[in-house]
């Protein structure tokens, strides 16, 4: 049986929390963190992987690159920054799309054909833009 592999773009608060939630629920055998700050992704992955050693099931978490998307079943987009006081989620749209500008070609190049879940704010608008740009 093919093992379930989930890739998370963004190793900040939301991406890392998403990874830990997936680990606790046993939703994947392999979780990959990708972040523009590779050292951050590696650090978060090492901490979470240590925690995973206590689970009654096998789960591996590590940092990786966009080539990991080729055989992933799920991609979670968690790229973005936190809201500042007084900002709405919609105020983050321009910034979120700017951050995704370099990521979209990398996703296309990876030949990813799984499920894309976008939790980058504003999630509904960013998700629709990703759907249109990725086909």
PLM-predicted stretches and their roles:
Residues 2-6:
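Extreme N-terminal starter segment of soluble prokaryotic enzymes
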Residues 11-12:
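Glycine-rich Rossmann-fold phosphate-binding loop(s) that bind the pyrophosphate
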Residues 24-30, 135:
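Conserved S-adenosyl-L-methionine
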Residues 36-73:
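Conserved N-terminal Rossmann-fold NAD(P) cofactor-binding segment
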Residues 79-81:
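Conserved NAD(P)H cofactor-binding loop of Rossmann-fold oxidoreductase domains
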């Amino acid at each position: 049986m093919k093992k379930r592999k989930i890739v998370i773009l963004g190793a900040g608060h939301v991406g890392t929390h998403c990874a830990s939630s997936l680990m606790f629920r046993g939703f994947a055998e392999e979780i990959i963190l990708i972040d523009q700050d590779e050292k951050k992704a590696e650090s978060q992955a090492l901490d979470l992987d240590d925690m995973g050693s206590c689970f009654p099931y096998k789960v591996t978490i590590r940092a990786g690159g966009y080539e990991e998307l080729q055989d992933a079943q799920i991609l979670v987009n968690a790229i973005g920054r936190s809201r500042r006081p007084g900002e709405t989620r919609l105020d983050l749209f321009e910034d979120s799309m700017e951050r995704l500008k370099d990521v979209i070609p990398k996703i296309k190049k990876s030949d990813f054909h799984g499920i894309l879940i976008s939790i980058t704010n504003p999630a509904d608008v960013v998700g629709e833009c990703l759907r249109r740009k990725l086909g």
